[in-house]
Each structure stands twice: as structure tokens, then as C-alpha cells.
């Protein structure tokens, strides 16, 4: 049975058992800061297990794409060297959310594995483990399924703590957990290794193929085990592992899927043997890299993007080891799409984007790969022990872009280790340990403050209202506020929009008889809107009724900018490609800022087209439609959900533009018609990190003011160059041309002066051990003049040493030169280090030319006077 057929057979079997087939979730976990990547099938169901979420099914099955290459679950260093470690794998799973439990879960698994209509594995080849205290699971296996007791192994707490066991599963330090039962396949006595729980269990004879977790608890941060609302089941079976069993091979790399990838990689790399560890690395890594890029991850120097960069660079290095001299990795995308595109259509739609990102990253790394390898080879050759120094590891990382695990790969091949402690010390100096301050100034959870209730937001339809105060907080404490206090007010209902989705919070006033509270910001804490500000006069206390009114003009400007971001997002996807996804935004009354995934700078032509497209949609003046519906209906309408945003069962779908140009989920405030935006102008485009671009723009009166300012600048420029609006470009070109010619004339004059100065200074040379030595200060010269004069002098002296200096803005500037024929006797770089230290500075360079500087001009004359003596003492 081929891998693709096995995947389909699994899903269809559980569908027949009443399970809903749920598509794989993204590799980027939604709204779960505890996970770097999706690494198990249950990740997308976490809130269901915790009872925080309900869906219209209680049984589910999926084939979940997973990545383990960072954080706690990190298989990267083993990939390519073992039979079963991968950065990317598929996890087959079936799940029960308070529906069936142990008996049904065990029966489902056994029937699929051993049933004649299914996988038909020989029962005598299967072993089972259970948690030592789980008598119920043991009895089901032994008495109901019929597995002999000698093939059922009880595993206790074997990791040094209560519930720390191979058979007590937990996703992380916190979260859903419970006892589990595992099914193992026995490859037979020809393979080394003992059954699970034995001293020889790490051998390859007995391989775990299915883990069935009985989800009973939620582990809190303090280690407490709380019962889940409903006992549930989470199972996982690695697709690649069970495929290897069915196809009668011992290594995952021997299954049909990997054999096809290895063959394609071998063809690209000129016929490398498919058994090569480096080729297995390449075949494995194309899967994780392609799927991560398809899910919106871009190479960068932090977080998920850095893990992706590490994997790409590891693949590039192993390709280099196999003889690749040009980018090759991106070429493997086509083979992967052919093999997995049917099961994962996003691979097909993202193919060009994947290839572009991989090619760009390969080309970037190629610039430093050879240099870094040479440095490492040199250090290894000079190594006296078996440990590569931490300073070398850090230099490779910091200067040449070598992730530490890549350096470890190379060390491992040579039987060497890394000095991790030294590396960490080197990293310490530049590691930014700053943590962003709490978004709200006060961390209410940490402070133990619970704000009861829920604020009803009325601001979609109203800009004011007569409301009642529920809570007043002064310095984080619940108490009445007096005039002058800075505090937080929570209303039962409010027209004030709280900051979320990139849109800033409203400002305005709360007023009542004898009192006034200035709202300077509105923020969200759970289900409550926090009105932050200053009590101008009167007293604030719970139960007080106030008139709440937002700054309406400010809200209107913000609405224009927010609606424009939706049109901009749609235009970017239409013009640059569907790989564009929102990475962040800021919408305030003055401007909009939109961050998005894209692998290169947006060209001026593309920016003009984007701007024109948005303005065309504005001019159409179509209504902005808002539909309140459920998530499934919203998806059917093609609504875009933004990464990082948490949506409930009921969502707000915003549609604007002709032919539903933009359809997004959004809880922000917006204009009624696109024409209300008025005008849209892009003010800047830039890169903020690898693979992420930023556009800033203005709308409405802000756009008009920007146009006016641009016009004023143009008129002033025209006046300065004595031209008109129409001729200003030609006039500026003429000024620049004249300036360039003047610079050439000045350079020529400086060259003549340098030649003349060189002739004069040559006469002051003193002879030291057969070398002519010149050391002189050139007042009024700059660094370039010093360099040119030094070159002139070297030509005139024949064989000698030149030191020239000047003082610019209170700082010493130094240049040292040694004629080529004399560099075997004395080095300009060594001389410069000595001189610079005398004037409180630093310097260095090549044997024939060096530069430096210093902070103490008062010691310059003494330093120059000592040059002949230094040459005499240090000449070789």
C-alpha cells in the first residue's frame, strides 16, 4: 500500500466510524504562544479538550502536518542520521471529545491494524504498553482484545517525577494530558533490540506505531492535575512509520514517498547515492521548508522564521557536501508538489512562492557558506583537543550565518563537539533580553485582579450613550477616584472602541453633573473595555451614571484608514500574488501601516498600480457590507481570517469594493461606502525583516495634506534651481551633472596636490635598516587625501614605510603604508595598531596599507616622531 493510499484508508475508516474528517491545521499554531509549530494532531483541538470550545462533532479524524525542528520537540540534529527522525511528518489521528473513551479507542485501533479489510497486520507481531496504574486499559487489551499478558508491558513513572512516564502523555509543561497506551510492531529477531520497558528497548526491533492517549487532565503551570470537563481521546500514528511497516522496509527513507524524493534530489545533484545521509537530509528538509512557506512562514533571524532559515541552510550545506556549486534546493519543489499536492492543494497554489523564497535564501547563504567553511576548516586544523571553541561557533553564526546546529553537524562528522558554554558567553553580549512592557501598563492577571462581567460594545451604531460605571481602578486597585487621579473605568456598555485588530482605541469624554473624565485610550482586557484616562473634576465610583461620548472626528479618520487597509490588502494579493498575508497593522487617525509577507522590495511600478487600484475602488463608492454569521459560512464566502486573531463562533464579515473585491473577518469600525475614504496615497514602502515588507499610507484629508506638502516641496525645489514645475526634473539633473563634474575636478586637483606633497615629503625621509621612512602630519587634509599621498610616496620611495596623519573635528586620522617589496620585513597593520594606541584609538589593516584613528590629538606629534624607532625595533 502506497503512502497516499494509506492516508486515505485511515481517514475513510474513521469516517465510517462516525468521525468527521477535519483538514490539517496550519503549521503555525493559532493563538497558542506555548507552541513554536504544530507538532501533533491534537494541537488544533486543544480548546475542545479543555472545554473552552464546542463544535458540531464529538468525533474527528485527521492527517495533520507536523514540524519538529525547534523548541522542546526538536528532531533537527538527528535528521538524516537515523531511520525515523524527520523535521516534517504527518500524524494520523482519531479524536473523541467527551464521546467514546478507552474501550472504543482500543477497539478502533486494533481493528484498523489487524482487520482483513484494513491493514491486516499479523497480531503476533504487535506489542502493547500501558501506564502502570491503568488497570482498565490492561484488562481491555488482555481480556477483550485477547493480547497475551506477556506482550502487554506496564510502564511506570520512569522519568524522575510523578506522572513523568513514557506512558503518561503531555503536550508540554502545561495543557491536556493523561495515561496512554502504545502499540509496537516487532520487526523480528534479525533486528537488534528488546521489547518496550526492557534495557534493550532503544534498539530498532520494536517500533512504536500508534499512541492512544486517554485525555483526563489539564496540567496547570504549578503542576496541579485538574480533571477535564469530559474524558476524551487523542491518538497519533506516524504516517511514515506505519507505511514502512506495511511496505516491509525498516527505514522511513525506504518508503515510496521518500524514495521518489530521494531519486529527484539525486537527479538534481548529479547522481548522488540515495543512501547518502546528506541526500536524506535534503529530501527530508524540502518537505518542512515547503510546507512552512506555504503556511506563511518566511526566513528571518527570529522565531519561526529563524527555524526555517536553519533548515534551509542545513539543506544547502549538505547539498554543498554532495558537490552542489549552485542553488539546487528550490528545484526539488516540483517533485514534492507532484507527490503531495493532491493531498495538500496549498502546495500547488504556493509553488512559485516556495521556489522564489528558497532560491533567494540559497543565494544569500552561498555568499558566506564557502568563507565560513574555510574558517571552520582552519580552526579544526589548528585544534588541539576535540572541542570547537565557542568563539568560533559564535563567529560562524554572527558573521557567516551558520546556525549552531549546522556547525554541530560538521563537528559531528569529524568526531568533534562544540563549546556551547563559550558560545553562550559570546552571545550574551549582544542578546537582547528586554521584554516588552505589559500592553496595559498593569498585568491584571499577574496582579490577581479579576474584572467581573462583560462590557457591551455599542460603538458600531452609536458615538455616545448614557451608561453606568461598573468598576473604577486607581493604580490597579478598586477604589473611588478623585480629581487628578489617573485611572481605569469599566462601563456596563460603551460606544468606545477598544484597541484590537491593529486599530487604536477611541478617546473622548465621560461627563456627569459636576464631573468630567478625559478618556485618553480604550483597551481590552478579556471581555471588558478599559477606559484609561484622567479624572479632571468630580468623583468616580461604581454605580455612577455618566454620558459617554467618543471623539467623533478622530473615529471618522481612523475608520477611513482601517477600511483602506482592507482594500490595500486585497490589492497586494491581486498584484503581488496570493502568498501575501497580513503580518501586522496599525490604524490610527493620522495614518495606516500595513506589514505583509513578500520576499522582495515592491517596485515603484507595482506601488503605482497598487495605489491606483485602491483609488479606483474608492471612486466606485460601493457600499461596505457587514454580515454577522458563523465561521463556516464566512469561510464559504471566501472571507480571509487573519493570523493571530481569535474568532468566536459568531464572526463579522466585511465586504467592500466591486465584485466583492475584499472579504475579510474584522471587528473594527469602518466607513459606510468606499467613497468615504476620499483619497489614498502611499507614503513609504520598506523592509522590516527578512520576508516582511511594510507600506505606510494616508487617506482623506491626511492624503490631501500629503499631496499639498509634496506640491510645496516641488515648487520650492523649482524656485531654488530657477525652473518651473514642468522643468524642475531637468533642472535638478543639470545641477547634479555640474556637481559631479566639480567633484571630478576637485579629485584631480587633490591628486596633483598629493603628488606635490609626496614629492616634498619624500625629501624628509630618513633611512632605517635599508628602508626609507616618512612620518608626517598633513594639516587640512582628509582621509582620502592621506591615502592618495601615501600611494604617491610609496611609488617615489622605492622601498620604505609611510605614516601620514591629520586632525579632523578633534579626532586623529592615521594612514600607514609599506611598499610591497618590504611587507616581508614589516607590516603596515602592526604599525597602525601601535600608533593608534598612542593616540587613544584603534587601527589595523593589510600588510601594505592600514588605517586608524584616535581621540587624543595632543599626543600625535610624539607618536609620529617615534615611528623610525619602532620600525628599527620591529623590522624582520
Swiss-Prot record:
One of its GO terms (molecular function) is zinc ion binding. The keyword Nucleus does not apply. Its cofactor is Zn(2+). It catalyses: tRNA(Ala) + L-alanine + ATP = L-alanyl-tRNA(Ala) + AMP + diphosphate. Zn(2+) binds at residues 562, 566, 666, 670. It is found in: Cytoplasm. GO terms for cellular component: cytosol. Keywords: Aminoacyl-tRNA synthetase, ATP-binding, Cytoplasm, Ligase, Metal-binding, Nucleotide-binding, Protein biosynthesis, RNA-binding, tRNA-binding, Zinc. One of its GO terms (biological process) is negative regulation of DNA-templated transcription. Catalyzes the attachment of alanine to tRNA(Ala) in a two-step reaction: alanine is first activated by ATP to form Ala-AMP and then transferred to the acceptor end of tRNA(Ala). Also edits incorrectly charged Ser-tRNA(Ala) and Gly-tRNA(Ala) via its editing domain. Belongs to the class-II aminoacyl-tRNA synthetase family. This is Alanine--tRNA ligase.
